[in-house]
Amino acid sequence: MRYTNYFIPTLKETPSDAEVVSHQLMLRAGMIRKLAAGIYNYLPLGLRSIRKVETIVREEMDRAGAIELLMPSVQPAELWQESTRWEQYGKELLRFKDRKDAEFCLGPTHEEVVTDIVRREVKSYRQMPFNLYQIQAKFRDEIRPRFGLMRGREFIMKDAYSFDVDSSASDLSYDKMYQAYRRIFQRCGLKFRAVEADTGSIGGSSSHEFMVLADSGEDAIVSCTQCEYAANVEKAEARPAPAEHAEPRPLEKVETPAKRSVEEVTAFLGIPSSALVKTLLVVADGTPVAALVRGDHDLNEIKLKHLLGCETLEMANEEMVTRVTGAPVGFAGPVGLNIKIVADLAVQGMKNFVTGANAGDLHLKNVTIGRDFTPTQYADIRNVVHGDPCPRCEAGHLELWRGIEVGHVFKLGTKYSEALRATYLDADGKEQIIFMGCYGIGISRTVAACIEQNHDADGIIFPIPIAPFHCIVSAVNTKDAEVMAACESLYLDLRAAGVEVLFDDRDERPGIKFKDADLIGIPLRLVVGSKNLADGKVELKSRRTGEVELLPLAGAVEKVRNIVAEALGR
């Protein structure tokens, strides 16, 4: 492709409303343009990278035995009402009525639709297993769309759904998809982690998220330094702390005037935050519950919600705290509370700790479990922290990372097939419920996450597999006939060798051309100038390393072809 015949509207300045690097660079590189809040046009360069990701996804899904189909974006309300998600999904589900007053939604996901297809067509165990997938634009009406393609309202997604006769067969389908996802993100050239995760609104028994590692990532993840354990911080398990062996000291009430926070109380009393236990009041389905965590730990509301088995969980407001404890916020404690108390495992072995006294400006010292109060139950309800011992092995400890979720695989079990009555007849002629899995990849989000991980001050640094072009040929002086002839020859020969090449044939200063090439992130740059050409040489520069190599003109195409072939695993 010749630059003068292509559409690359680059920007010199960063738009003021672009907050994260990927959004800034995709706008500046002419890859996307905003149409409305959270809705973007994919311009030619951006679409090329998206198509690269789609191709890798299709190849690996096909390799894993999945079958492509395409389902409508518009879905009837009846299906969502059958699964009960019409009420549960909330305002992210864009709902509307047609001219006959029938209700529909714009699909954010397709569990209901694909289950409806299968319940109509599958009758026997002999028709399974199979896996159906599609690549399609989805819509979720995010309350605050931001960060460009990272959190848009419309986005391109690959969603797949497996159908099996039982749980063990479904586990095999799940593992196939898990391995396919690993291959997909490896082929995209990304550094990532597959982590244990919460199933969220999709539901099901278990799931894994695929996280691209990036300092700007919204999600916190942990991994072990010694074994393969990795999890989203919402799901990560904490190993119980060893019990303290100190003798209990007498309970003591101390004045802590206007000292509410952990930092204020511990500084005032001269103790470490690990010697204080926070009493956090939550409301679970309308019922107050006290959650106890160490002062240097944070409550994991998702763990607590699963433990309590509630539909809704929220922090108690000031009025509720005062009504339950008799004290203002900041002075709650477990001693004397007449509600359910859930204590974190790290609290279980503690003695002589500090808590609120359920009275304003007062705390209790030397609180001891068993003597002063007894929790209703102990459970892992905290977020892990950097350096925690690994819950799976004896040797390792947990490291914290930031990540961007680009893929998620779920074991759905019979959640949707039971709700929509998707059944089959087994070998004995008995009716059974179909077991399902679902598997999503954010195609457009993967491109944005790649940029978050791969950039510098000059622009994007695309990995070769998903770069819009593999190589750019830059003519230093377009008025030099020999330079242009050499560029033309390189351009045609690179194309013939299977290299995707952009020929920058613009009549611009070399500095402008080089800046644009760096901004766009094309991995390899061949520079043809009259001085080097007089010696039969051209310059090859790596966008990632910045290394420059002078090559014989005759060997330049072979060199580039080999670099590209190695990166693509050809």
From Swiss-Prot:
Location(s) in or outside the cell: Cytoplasm
EC number: 6.1.1.15
Main localisation: cytoplasm
GO molecular function: aminoacyl-tRNA deacylase activity; ATP binding; proline-tRNA ligase activity
One GO biological process term: prolyl-tRNA aminoacylation
Pfam families in alphabetical order: HGTP_anticodon, tRNA-synt_2b, tRNA_edit
InterPro entries: aa-tRNA-synt_IIb (IPR002314), aa-tRNA-synth_II (IPR006195), aa-tRNA-synth_II/BPL/LPL (IPR045864), Anticodon-bd (IPR004154), Anticodon-bd_dom_sf (IPR036621), Pro-tRNA-ligase_IIa (IPR002316), Pro-tRNA-synth_IIa_bac-type (IPR004500), Pro-tRNA-Synthase_IIa_type1 (IPR023717)
A GO CC annotation given for this chain: cytosol
Transmembrane segments: none
Keyword terms: Aminoacyl-tRNA synthetase, ATP-binding, Cytoplasm, Ligase, Nucleotide-binding, Protein biosynthesis
Record's catalysed reaction(s): tRNA(Pro) + L-proline + ATP = L-prolyl-tRNA(Pro) + AMP + diphosphate
Domain notes: Consists of three domains: the N-terminal catalytic domain, the editing domain and the C-terminal anticodon-binding domain.
Function field: Catalyzes the attachment of proline to tRNA(Pro) in a two-step reaction: proline is first activated by ATP to form Pro-AMP and then transferred to the acceptor end of tRNA(Pro). As ProRS can inadvertently accommodate and process non-cognate amino acids such as alanine and cysteine, to avoid such errors it has two additional distinct editing activities against alanine. One activity is designated as 'pretransfer' editing and involves the tRNA(Pro)-independent hydrolysis of activated Ala-AMP.
NCBIfam families noted in UniProt: PRK09194.1, proS_fam_II
Name of protein: Proline--tRNA ligase
Organism for this UniProt entry: Geobacter sulfurreducens (strain ATCC 51573 / DSM 12127 / PCA)
Organism placement in taxonomy: Bacteria, Pseudomonadati, Thermodesulfobacteriota, Desulfuromonadia, Geobacterales
Gene, per the UniProt record: proS
